[in-house]
């Protein structure tokens, strides 16, 4: 979900005072604004927040965090789908999309000539929505006029000019999202571009113009149809509908109903904007490298002139108590699972602290009731819980999936059984104290990045909770005792819940059909004075910082074992990882062996007790086996470093086999394998892509047979773990201790540090040289069609990294890319589309060109034709190319790889045969590339290749004669691409 907004006319800014000419929308005026700093006890605030309120009511949340010369920015509006009119749902989401379309000052070649056409289009939509949907001929007649006028108006529009500007200042992660009661606009920007960003955002929200609406409308249709194919979304919406039969939470989805989507109203969207997009209903939330005093001056300079308005009170619909169990079901092709949901009061209720504590007692990933009694005991698959807290009401959701030969009713009963355990107080006395420690540690981790910090402000503001109260949540939870939770549980958890079963089957649902849309002009070369002026403003450039492979990591030794060390200067958290080059490409059994470990105990402790000990320590322990590596990881607070390492080493030396656990693990592995073949993301992006690259013998299919799994013995798995643990490895440490202390402690504690075994060479997989174009089709029950076009190129060539980075940014890498503009903005053929020339992870692997488009099945012909036209003949735009260059340069200047990520970055680079930071090569060369260079790269590496086409869709909706134009059509089976 992404996309675009506030008022009309001119903003003239002096250095210390602001003179604003009143706009036609009356949200924007005067003025010499003032702002107030909110006072509260900063000692209780780990973020040391400064909260300002401008004279017009705009809230500003600021936290300084100088980890990198960048800022995470979020502009939050307290308006979401619950505020949509009941007869025009989806407005908040539509408006979010339109806030990327520009104003009367940017996004247009000539607004004076454009506006009369936009006014006519707006009126035509009002006519259109009044005509009954049964009157097809009349609606088609009006739609034809809308399409024609939209094409005329588009001649004056400049598509994606907002995206060009944010890219030009080096922004990353540009996006937006709408939910029940908030709409949030986000950017990650360089710290030397603050004023440009504020100037752009001020203009964006001043007077949004709803241009290019009918192509964006089709994009929303695509988003709706993707939702209709998403079993998880269907399950969640059905749950909300059951729990909230009257309130908008259950009766108005963010995307809107099909009926309302087909009858949009620009006038209603404008009313929504005028009503809710006012400063006293908005907040600017920023975390990063800046000075708060100068930041608030700039925010006041650019936003102080917005006029406050009274925001209508939201009338909360009172729900009647749920007095019996409500059962619902949804169907779809993906794996079975269920939700159990209880209704609770809203975010401001004092009971919310008890709800959060109850949720952690039920499920905290390690030692909750569901974690231990159901997951660790292997009674269900993937059980857990989460609180869904909103302003008016909240929901406590429990979830789980069935094992082999288990039905959803059994999963429900097992989850409800754990709720009864909570009500009876059958949880250990120490657990609540450990939960508080866990929450504090999770908060430390969350606050180690700007996004986590800014998101906290958005959450508090949009829930209507004062920050001074929000930051005391953990302290308030720490005051609760066991009896408080028992009483709370018995008050709320009764036969008063909704259970929604996600069953397998064919879902007969209406989809949003494709309207006839004539492709519109995108005016790629045009630029407004606003863009030229903004990007021409000079800033003090920030010098890039590149990784020094020799000096940015400290290297030590633990006897024979290499130690890679990075110091944590920020807090008391540590991470310790043992890395073995012994992944599934060495032996597929290793994956099951290390999965088996998590369910084992020792002679002195059970598997459950192992989890409880870790949770008491505030530590986590994990075992992961990928294609390449086995990683044994522990993390936690430094005060428990020695004890955690001792526990890990003792466990690895003394774990004992458990035949019952192994049998259950086998069953679960086979069930998860079966479920994976129902997941369209796994099918397309893993199974089919690997098949295209390697054929049937690929890293993805390098798995044990089901027969082998059924016959494997505990001794085999125990032997594999011990073999790996006794082999050569490296130790990676990130934490607050000095390297000498780490070496000293691990020399004592780490047992396998000498006389280590060599690891056998990994299996190599041969990439297929395809001589002729081929279309591989796989049948899947869904409304959409998803297509990947892929072609093999040369082996890893580091000299291609700079030019391919520029090509990707220009051609297919973002919202201002050629592919996005043509296929989404101009032709409205897709919600999601991208193209990338990949850089392989290993020396002997090849580059691949991979392009993706997700579209409605009835638009597949146009979508594939549009994509192939672009792949075979790249449109040229000097303006877009220069913007792509500048965006890359600004990102590299301000990107900082820090903390433990430095070790991971160097490790990946060395596997590619690199001895230095590839970003330095990009930075030093990218300005030298011309359009001819990019075109030559495209013609040589992308155009007219022996493409392999991967198509995932419902065969009943596909014209195979069309597909045969692209190559020989071969029908794949799940068994063939999964290897089992």
Please provide the spans of the model-predicted regions:
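Short strand-connecting beta-turns/loops that link adjacent beta-strands
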Residues: 66-68, 278, 333-334, 392, ...
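N-terminal Sec-pathway targeting helices
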Residues: 1-11
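His/Glu-based metal-binding/catalytic segments typifying zinc-dependent metallopeptidases
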Residues: 225, 241, 312-367, 399, ...
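Mature N-terminal segment immediately following signal peptide/propeptide cleavage
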Residues: 38-75, 554-570
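Charge-rich, well-structured scaffold segments of protease-associated domains
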Residues: 28-29, 53, 64, 111-311, ...
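Active/ligand-binding-proximal structured segments within catalytic/core domains
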Residues: 57, 66-111, 115, 334, ...
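Bacterial Sec-dependent signal peptides at the C-terminal "C-region" and cleavage site
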Residues: 13-42
